[in-house]
Amino acid sequence: MKTPITVTVTGAAGQIAYSLLFRIASGSMLGPDQPINLRLLEIPPAMNALEGVVMELRDAAFPLVNEIVPTSDPDEAFAGANWCLLVGSVPRKAGMERKDLLDINGKVFIGQGQAIARSAAKDVRVLVVGNPCNTNALIAMHNASGVPSDRFFAMTRLDENRAKSQLAEKAGVHVTEVTNMAIWGNHSSTQYPDFTNARIGGKPVTEVIKDTEWLKGDFITTVQQRGAAIIKARGASSAASAASAAVDTVRSLATQTPEGDWYSVAVCSDGSYGIEKGLICSFPVRTTKDGGWEIVQGLPVDAFSREKIDATVNELKEERDAVSSLLKH
C-alpha cells in the first residue's frame, strides 16, 4: 500500500468544502489507489458543524481515508501537509469595499502562511481557493518563510472550465473537444479567457466559431460574470463547480500534461509575457514529467489580448499595493 498523502482543507465546514471533501476521499483528486490523511481546519464557532461533516465522512466509509483530524488550530491542521487547499475566506458582505475584504482576509492568510512554514511537509503545495484568491495566495506566500514561491497557486480552473463549456456549447461539440484554454490574470471580473490560442477539435477556435463579435463580447463577459449569475439564480455562490475545479487543478499539477495542451492556474510570475515578476497571476501552465510545472512560452498575444491582459494585471497590482503592509519584502 502507498504511503498516505496528507491533505489539509481550510474552511472545512463551508459549502465548497462540503462538495470537495467527498471527492478527495473517494480518490477523484489523487487517484484510486492513494490513501489520504485528511486534516480539516475551521474557526472555533464552526467546529460543531465540522463535527457533522466528519460524521458524514466516516459514514461514507471511504477505503482510501486513513485518518481524519478536525481542528481549529492551524499548526495541527497543517502538520505534515503535502497538499493545502485554502478554501476558507471571509465572504464579501453588502457595503464592504474590496479593500476591506483584502484586509480582513489578509490577516487570515498571514497566519496560515506562517503555520504552513512551521508545520507542513517539506514538499508542501498550496492551492488557494478562497477569494480574493490571487492576493490571498500572495499574502500566504510572503508569510511562509522558507517555502519556495513555486509551491503556491491560486485557482482559475473554474474560469477555464466555464470558458470551455461556453465554447463547446456555441460550437455544438462535447466539452472534451475544447483544449488549450488559457485564463490570464486575476480570478475576478477582469480575467481574460483567451479564445485566440484555444482549440476546438484541434483547430483554432476562430476557424470553428466564425462569430468574432460573440467571442470578443458575450463569451468573455459570460465567463467573467458567471459567478454573479449563479448567485442571482441559486441564491448562493458556486460551490460544487468550484470544488470540482479544485480537484481538476490538483490532478493537473500532480500529473504530466498531455503533449501540446496546457491548463490555467495562477502562479508567481517570473516576468513572462511582460507580467510583473512576483504577482500571483493566472497563466497557461504545463506539468512536466519530473513533477514540476512551467509557464507555456511563446504564445502569440495580439493587440486585443494584450489590452485585456494588461487590464487584469493592473487590478492585481492594485490589490497587491492595497495589502503591501502585509507582505514581507
From Swiss-Prot:
Q: EC number(s) on record?
A: 1.1.1.37
Provide any one GO MF term from the record. Answer: L-malate dehydrogenase (NAD+) activity
Q: Where does the record place a coiled coil?
A: none
Question: PROSITE patterns attached here?
Answer: MDH
Q: Which reaction does it catalyse?
A: (S)-malate + NAD(+) = oxaloacetate + NADH + H(+)
Highest taxon of the lineage: Bacteria
Which catalytic residues are annotated? 187 (proton acceptor)
UniProt keyword list: NAD, Oxidoreductase, Tricarboxylic acid cycle
- Record-listed NAD(+) binding positions: 11-17, 105, 112, 129-131
- Role of this protein: Catalyzes the reversible oxidation of malate to oxaloacetate.
> What family is this protein classified in?
Belongs to the LDH/MDH superfamily. MDH type 2 family.
Indicate what this protein is called per its UniProt record: Malate dehydrogenase
Q: Which organism is it from?
A: Akkermansia muciniphila (strain ATCC BAA-835 / DSM 22959 / JCM 33894 / BCRC 81048 / CCUG 64013 / CIP 107961 / Muc)
